[in-house]
Amino acid sequence: MTQDELKRLVGQAAADYVIQNVPEGAVIGVGTGSTANCFIDALAAVKSRYRGAVSSSVATTERLKSHGIKVFDLNEIDALQVYVDGADEIDAGGAMIKGGGGALTREKIVASVADTFVCIADGSKRVPVLGAFPLPIEVVPMARTAIGRRVTALGGVPVLRVTKDGAPYITDNGNEIIDVKGLQIADPRGFEARVNAWPGVVTVGLFAERGANLCLLGTENGVETIVYPAA
């Protein structure tokens, strides 16, 4: 199967998981990116079962609304039973690198509220150690250079994310993103806490403190379900 076919496979598997485990009338947390889009497309077929969704980005909001799925602000919701999102990398403990699509801060906020985080990914995203995929850090623009120096001191190579025309990429929150290459993150929780403490960091794209509860992993043999132990 192609990577796109694997994404559609796990998108449908996530919709099936929601149908089986989330009661009718609930609100679903939805992530951002190409794999999350496959979940949205599958969810659209059963949208009448649920009140709607909480979105993690402007792009996701637009896709949900295009399917006629009502979008709630997180502040309107008392509880969120499930959050479904992709990952750029996921390790054996359920820690992830996320943020390739630029929505890491809102993704982390919505994930933190959800009872269950369901990661959906193709098999190439499973890694023994996080860091081959550049680690995104959303930063306040004036802190970009200072954060870059801190990253360099840890052995990373900071690269400012830019648009096709060479301008700094701007997040939905009005900030910039540094993508850090050359890392091997043996202690995701510790590294997440360390970077998040730097002045000027909005959030780092490490999801270790709030990692996945389970992963639906698309493989040539079908969908593999991996359950991670509670922290």
Curated annotation (Swiss-Prot):
Catalytic activity reads:
aldehydo-D-ribose 5-phosphate = D-ribulose 5-phosphate
Location of the active site: 107 (proton acceptor)
Keywords (A to Z) from UniProt = Isomerase
The molecular function GO annotations come to:
ribose-5-phosphate isomerase activity
Pathway assigned to this chain's UniProt record: Carbohydrate degradation; pentose phosphate pathway; D-ribose 5-phosphate from D-ribulose 5-phosphate (non-oxidative stage): step 1/1
Query: What Gene3D superfamilies does UniProt report for this protein, alphabetically?
Result: 3.30.70.260, 3.40.50.1360
Q: Per the record, GO CC terms?
A: cytosol
The family database entries (InterPro entries) matched by this protein are listed as: NagB/RpiA_transferase-like, Ribose5P_isomerase_typA_subgr, Ribose5P_isomerase_type_A
Enzyme Commission number: 5.3.1.6
* Superkingdom in the source lineage: Bacteria
Family annotation (CDD domains): RPI_A
- In this chain, substrate is annotated as bound at 32-35, 85-88, 98-101, 125
Q: What's a GO biological-process term for it?
A: D-ribose metabolic process
Q: What is an example of a Pfam family matching this protein?
A: Rib_5-P_isom_A
* Record's function text: Catalyzes the reversible conversion of ribose-5-phosphate to ribulose 5-phosphate.
According to the record's subunit comment, the protein's assembly and interactions are: Homodimer.
Q: Which family does it belong to?
A: Belongs to the ribose 5-phosphate isomerase family.
- Please report the name of this protein according to its UniProt entry: Ribose-5-phosphate isomerase A
**Origin species:** Burkholderia cenocepacia (strain ATCC BAA-245 / DSM 16553 / LMG 16656 / NCTC 13227 / J2315 / CF5610) (Burkholderia cepacia (strain J2315))
Gene designation per UniProt? rpiA
